[in-house]
Every structure is written in structure tokens, then in C-alpha cells.
Amino acid sequence: MAVTKKLILASGSPRRVELLAQAGIEPARLMPMDLDETPKRSEHPRSLARRLSAEKAKAALSAITGDPAWDGSYILAADTVVCVGRRILPKPELVSEASSALHLLSGRSHRVYTGICLVTPDRTLRQKVIDTKVRFKRLSTLDIESYLASGQWRGKAGGYGIQGIAGGFVVKLVGSYTNVVGLPLYETVNLLVGEGYDVHDRWLEG
């Protein structure tokens, strides 16, 4: 049996690790990349997701270059952007920012873009951007105050995590659910398979 080449995940997101585990994929190394995620002037949310995922992948590649232990490895990076129209809703740092985001999302449709970037063993970059449309119910004051108190908004693009309490806010979703969680699993697995990564290697171990 051919040896499966190592996969580096250029992220520290527990959600992305969990999603990969669902597909039987276990990264050999996690490499969170601390980059400036500020959008450029007039940058479209889709373009931002694409750019940041590529920058994370390139930063991880630069960090391992020259280390023979990681020769021929794959590097996977992702970045998720939530927006209402072209207004980008970043990860809130303060309760007030999360509150503003929830008020904006209330009763409206928004889009979630996730850019995924794969560095192949021959150091070629392969990219995709996945788009999901989500509509929230009209949130009551109690909904918002209770959600803020739960703390589940922390570290989440757009100030919410669909896999938690906020899943009950969703009236309609068109597209990939896992994209909203943080990594479009179907598209990610297809990208890996298309570039020769053996995703089936650990299925029998379960």
C-alpha cells in the first residue's frame, strides 16, 4: 500500500479539525497562521476569502521550507467570510460588536464564503471558494441577549456558530452546511482526492 503523504492544516480551528475527522482525515500538524485579515478597500467578500486562504497556505509553506520532515507534504488552508450584501462581518472581539452583527443578521439573508487553498506536494496552489446563502429568523431581544450571554459568538465569523445554539436561528440554508461551520467538506475532500491525497487510508481504522 502506498504511504499517505502528510497533511498540514494551516489553522487552529477545532471546527475544521472535527470536520476533517468526519471524513477520516487527520492532519499531521496544525499550523495556525496569524495574519492581518483586514479587507482591502472595496474588496469583495469572495475575493477576501480567496486571498486570505492563499496567504495562510503560503505562510505555512514558507514556515516548513527547508525542513526535510515536511518534504512532499500537503498544506490545507481556509478562511471563512460572512457578509450582508458587501458588508463584511468579521469575528467580533467585543460583546457590542457581536450584538451589532446579530441585529444586522436578524430577519435577513446573508452569505458565507469559504476560500480553501491546497498546496500540493509539487508546491502548486489549488483554490476554490464556496458560497452558502443563509436566512435568519427575526431575532427577539431575548434571543440576542441570551445568545450573547452564552458566549458562543466568540471566535466566530459573523458572530455566530451554526453548529451551536444559533442553528435554531436559521430559517433557510442554500448550499453547503459545513461551509458555514468553517470548511466545505465535500469540496475539500474532492480537492484533496483530485490532487492525489488518499482520503480512504484511515477509513478502515474506524
Swiss-Prot record:
GO molecular function, one term: UTP diphosphatase activity
Recorded family membership: Belongs to the Maf family. YhdE subfamily.
Enzyme Commission code(s) on record: 3.6.1.9
Cofactor: a divalent metal cation
Catalytic activity: dTTP + H2O = dTMP + diphosphate + H(+); UTP + H2O = UMP + diphosphate + H(+)
The entry's keywords: Cytoplasm, Hydrolase, Nucleotide metabolism
Keyword flag Cytoplasm: yes
GO cellular component: cytoplasm
UniProt cross-references to InterPro entries, sorted A to Z: ITPase-like_fam, Maf-like
One GO BP annotation of this record: nucleotide metabolic process
Chief location category: cytoplasm
Protein's name according to its UniProt entry: dTTP/UTP pyrophosphatase
Location relative to the cell: Cytoplasm
Role description: Nucleoside triphosphate pyrophosphatase that hydrolyzes dTTP and UTP. May have a dual role in cell division arrest and in preventing the incorporation of modified nucleotides into cellular nucleic acids.
Enzyme class: hydrolase
Positions marked as site (Important for substrate specificity): 15, 80, 163
A matching Pfam family: Maf
Organism: Rhizobium meliloti (strain 1021)
UniProt-annotated catalytic positions: 79 (proton acceptor)
